[in-house]
Regions:
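N-terminal targeting signals for export/organelle localization
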Residues: 2-45, 312-316, 328
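C-terminal cap of thioredoxin/glutaredoxin-like
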Residues: 25-30, 34-35, 78, 172-328
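Secreted/processed peptides and extracellular or luminal domains of membrane proteins
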Residues: 41, 71-74
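Extreme N-terminus of proteins, especially the signal/transit-peptide cleavage junction
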Residues: 46-54, 83
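Short active-site neighborhood of thiol/selenol oxidoreductases, capturing the structured segment around
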Residues: 52-66, 75, 88-92
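An acidic- and aromatic-residue-enriched active-site/binding cleft used to recognize and process polar
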Residues: 62, 93-95, 237, 247
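The canonical Cys-X-X-Cys-His
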Residues: 65-68, 232-233
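Structural alpha/beta surface segment adjacent to cysteine/selenocysteine redox centers
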Residues: 73-177, 286-289
């Protein structure tokens, strides 16, 4: 059998058998397991073309950005369905270095830590990505820089995917489970639960080199012209970009990707099965399942019970929202 791979096309030439087969070929069907005379043509042209990743998606964000937490369901589906069109790059922007006497976010009425609590709760209620926020009254996050530096150190040594997983776990801890992610002990625990050495990573994150890594992201944010969080920027190979600021519906991001690619049509990938997604994420909130699989809120529990074995997941609730975790 001869395979020729050129210009993403494959010409498959099947070897001829003996004359007694009368030009028919014998093969075993991969799906049915049945072996016999094949009905396919001897020569077929098959297109193995995969879209070339000519786009970079820059996701400008911060660990304590509540609106970034709110778009997690939409962003995950964008990556799962259309991630084969772009390279995904997280860029941290430094939302809060430290509290001071001046305004932090006057547009949202935030001048002191306690002002954050009400704003976060509103974002959580509107998005249905649960946010407690009460720690900002009695044990406020003092800075987003420590968790950002941890992200950069993990990214340096363990890659983008592991760093992004840390970012997700940190946001779960902060927003839904009310843990202070400017606390070194909390960060060490989150990193340890990823199977990494929290003490080693936190030590490096607190060195000047850790801040140097973060400063590189700050410089990129300035170059990209991002002025708020979240900002998503699609940049194509001609170095032209489409910038989308703030949390938007999925269709807006898809349209932005189409514009960057200069195409009218995209081919979405098949969505992952629920079991694989939950095993990867470890924790999924109801809203995330609704957005990923187009399920009504009232049907989420029955959907999960249908898709998963009873012993493979746990159903829990926080702030009036259901969420699902793996059993282990």
């Amino acid at each position: 059998m001869v395979y020729s791979f050129k210009n993403h096309q494959t010409l498959i030439l099947k070897q001829k058998r003996g004359n007694n087969l009368k030009n028919n070929d014998m093969f075993c069907d991969l799906e049915t397991g049945v072996c016999g005379v094949g009905e396919e043509e001897d020569i077929q042209v098959i297109d193995f073309h995969q879209p070339k990743k000519t786009i970079t998606l820059y996701y400008v964000t911060d660990p304590i950005c509540s609106h970034c937490w709110a778009i997690e369901p939409v962003l995950r589906r964008l990556k799962e369905e259309y991630g084969h069109y772009f390279h995904f790059q997280t860029v941290l922007g430094g939302l809060l270095e430290k509290w001071h006497d001046g305004p932090i976010d006057p547009a949202n009425g935030i001048y002191k830590p306690a002002d954050v609590a009400g704003h976060w709760r509103e974002v959580g209620e509107h998005s249905r990505m649960p946010i407690d926020g009460s720690l900002m009254i009695d044990n406020p996050v003092q800075s987003s820089y420590p968790s950002s530096r941890v992200f950069k150190v993990i990214q340096k040594h363990h890659g983008d995917e592991q760093a992004y997983t840390f970012l997700r776990r940190a946001r779960e801890a902060l927003f839904s489970f009310n843990q202070n992610i400017s606390d070194i002990a909390v960060l060490i625990d989150i990193v340890n639960n990823l199977g990494l050495n929290g003490d080693v990573i936190l030590h490096e994150a607190e060195l000047p080199s850790g801040q140097d890594l973060l400063n590189q992201d700050f410089a990129l944010v300035r170059d990209l012209g991002a002025r708020g969080f979240p900002t998503i920027i699609f940049v194509n190979e001609e170095n032209k970009g489409v910038k989308i600021t703030g949390g938007r519906p999925l269709d807006v991001y898809i349209d932005g990707l189409k514009q960057a690619l200069n195409t009218e049509e995209l081919q979405p990938k098949k969505l992952p099965v629920v079991s694989a997604l939950l095993e990867k994420e470890k924790c999924l909130f109801s809203k995330e399942i609704e957005v990923m699989y187009d399920v009504d809120q009232s049907d989420v529990r029955s959907f999960m019970e249908k898709e998963l074995s009873q012993e493979s997941f746990q159903l829990k609730e926080v702030l009036g929202e259901q969420y699902f975790t793996t059993s282990t």
